[in-house]
From Swiss-Prot:
All residue ranges annotated as the KRAB domain in the record: 8-81
Mapped zinc finger ranges (C2H2-type): 215-237, 243-265, 271-293, 299-321, 327-349, 355-377, 383-405, 411-433, 439-461
Protein name, entry field: Zinc finger protein 525
Main location: nucleus
Gene Ontology biological process terms from the UniProt entry: regulation of DNA-templated transcription
Organism field: Homo sapiens
SUPFAM superfamilies referenced in this protein's UniProt entry, alphabetically: beta-beta-alpha zinc fingers, KRAB domain (Kruppel-associated box)
Function summary: May be involved in transcriptional regulation.
């Protein structure tokens, strides 16, 4: 009994975009589209299709987009027992085709197909016989004609309605390995936006994930659906860096990384905030900046529910709970939870204070201290108390001042339960309990627990009497 014949076209495994829709795709989506189309063709070949097809590619020119016609014939030779086919030449040409597309993308061509490749393949026909079984052969002939729509980068304006042309009668007589899955085509119209494009690509991506990952990296064992993805991954192991900066000779493994890096030299800041007009060199920086206006803090600590604008800030905060201090001083072995703390600590060993005031040349170990110091030159006092109208140079000073109005004393001694408005007052008080006397008189060697006590004591040696009576002008050493 003759096996059934059916009509198979490349449309059964293609997604089609109009020229306008293609322009909406970003480079990552175009790369995904290319990989999917090549994988579909590879699948047709791997199922036993003898192909002789010319894949003419196209490019954008000043006269417009050049249309290309793909013609060929796909004949499928299948048997009851599928033989061992030799597709090395086809696979080689497919890889060359992929490589040429990637090269054109790197060179900045809008439509990256620029050359003509011929994919030639032939299947070696074998007669397979089991004991007592006669060979069963049949041909599933199909006409493979593509007028730009078969690799389907572009399609004329208007709706695209691609109906499934494949029909197989008596499917029960065909084995599972001999069937090609027939799925409905997607209907695309111009009024569909990016959501549709993403959805159609997502559908293809979900299919890819269901397939076996047959391209495996020997170094790491990681597997990929496509050989092109494997080659990109292998660059990591090989140390191959293809894109070099002309200014500083720094090299990058991705073209987009180089483009982003070049903005450091050019000063280009293409991303602008609509709220305040501030510009940024990277989109991610603008995204973070927007959160200053919106107040959004999407990163939340699971331990204390504190929220942060940036993931890096959350990671640093988590070390408070874990006690992790990954940054170690090579001089003294002291460890710190944040890299900035280590950098400031190193100034103790080097004596270097990297943050210098332009007005008075005074230097500081911390950038925040320099910012606070600069206000002394400008006289700016931007922080105002709502209760009494007094203004302050620093927010921390205003916070402490407010406690005079509220009576709040948040700092409590663990020994005697006495409370204080300021942390410095608590630190001085603790010396009463532990007997610590940090301040020593250079004249007599007497020590004191507080700096004020030492200052008053020194007047006994100097004879200084700064406290003067307003009535009789008599002076005293102590107030």
């Amino acid at each position: 009994m003759a096996l059934p014949q059916g009509l198979l076209t490349f449309r059964d495994v293609a997604i089609e975009f109009s020229q306008e829709e293609w322009k909406c795709l970003d480079p990552a989506q175009r790369t995904l589209y290319r990989d999917v189309m090549l994988e579909n063709y590879r699948n047709l070949v791997s199922l036993g299709i003898s192909s002789k097809c010319t894949m003419k590619e196209f490019s954008s020119t000043a006269q417009g987009n050049t249309e290309v016609i793909h013609t060929g014939t796909l004949q499928r030779h299948e048997r009851h027992h599928i033989g061992d086919f030799s597709f090395q030449e086809i696979e080689k040409d497919i890889h060359n085709f992929e490589f040429q597309w990637q090269e054109d993308e790197r060179n900045g061509h809008e439509a990256p197909m620029t050359k003509i490749k011929k994919l030639m393949g032939s299947t070696e026909q074998y007669d397979h016989r089991h004991a007592g079984n006669k060979p069963i052969k049949y041909q599933l002939g199909s006409s493979f004609h593509s007028h730009l729509s078969e690799l389907h980068i572009f399609q004329p304006k208007g709706k695209i309605n691609n109906q499934v042309e494949k029909s197989i009668n008596d499917a029960s007589s065909v084995s599972t390995a001999q069937r090609i899955s027939c799925r409905p085509k997607t209907h695309i119209s111009n009024n569909y936006g990016d959501n549709f494009l993403n959805y159609s690509l997502l559908t293809q991506r979900q299919e890819v994930r269901m397939r076996e990952k047959s391209f495996q990296c020997i170094e790491s064992g990681k597997a990929f659906n496509y050989s092109s993805l494997l080659r990109k991954h292998q660059i990591i192991h090989l140390g191959e860096k293809q894109y070099k900066c002309d200014v500083c000779d720094k090299v990058f493994i991705r073209k987009r990384y180089l483009a982003r890096h070049r903005r450091c030299h050019t000063g280009e800041k293409p991303y602008k905030c609509n709220e305040c007009g501030k510009s940024f060199s990277q989109m991610s920086s603008l995204t973070y900046h927007h959160r200053l206006h919106t107040g959004e803090k999407p990163y939340k600590c699971e331990e204390c529910d504190k929220a942060f604008r940036h993931n890096s800030a959350l990671q640093r905060h988590r070390r408070i709970h874990t006690g992790e201090k990954p940054h170690k001083c090579n001089e003294c072995g002291k460890t710190f939870s944040q890299k900035s703390y280590l950098a400031c600590h190193r100034s103790i060993h080097t004596g270097k204070k990297p943050y210098e005031c332009e007005e008075c040349d005074k230097a500081f170990s911390f950038k925040s201290n320099l910012e606070s110091h600069r206000i002394t030159h400008t006289g700016e006092k931007p922080y105002k108390c709502n209760d009494c109208g007094k203004t302050f140079s620093h927010m921390s000073t205003l916070t402490c001042h407010r406690r005079l109005h509220t009576g709040e004393k948040p700092y409590k001694c663990e020994e005697c339960d006495e409370a204080f408005r300021f942390k410095s007052s608590l630190e001085r008080h603790r010396r009463i309990h532990n007997g610590e006397k940090l301040y020593k008189c250079n004249e007599c060697g007497k020590t004191f627990s507080q700096e004020l006590s030492l200052t008053c004591h020194c007047r006994l040696h100097s004879g200084e009497k700064p406290c003067k009576c307003g009535e009789c002008d008599k002076a005293y050493s102590f107030k």
